[in-house]
Amino acid sequence: MEKQRKEYEELKQKLKQALHEKKVQEQEWDQIQQEIFDKETEYLSGNASSKYGTIVKGFDGFGKHASQDSHHFQDQDRIFSLSSALFVKQQEGVQDEE
């Protein structure tokens, strides 16, 4: 009986440790996805070097004067963020709360 109790306590401790590690990994994953989202927003919003186009939208304005607002983009332009189904689901949850 004592041996089973000891084994139970060891397994219980391993489970606690595994759950803690899982939580840490999920937090890191969320942070990485948020960083991707932020960098993607920064890139799609544009700066002086991207006024003629981006990899995502193309470079139609390269040979022209880019007088139009090139800083406008839609969520469908987010090819990296949208590639993560979990991140999309989380973002939809955030929008529902607002």
From Swiss-Prot:
One Pfam family matching this protein: NuA4
Record has Nucleotide-binding as a keyword: no
Keywords per UniProt: Chromatin regulator, Coiled coil, DNA damage, DNA repair, Nucleus, Transcription, Transcription regulation
InterPro entries found in the cross-reference section: Eaf6
One of the GO BP terms on file: DNA repair
Location of the protein in the cell: Nucleus
Domain of life: Eukaryota
Entry's family note: Belongs to the EAF6 family.
Function, in words: Component of the NuA4 histone acetyltransferase complex which is involved in transcriptional activation of selected genes principally by acetylation of nucleosomal histone H4 and H2A. The NuA4 complex is also involved in DNA repair.
Subunit details: Component of the NuA4 histone acetyltransferase complex.
Name used for this protein in its record: Chromatin modification-related protein EAF6
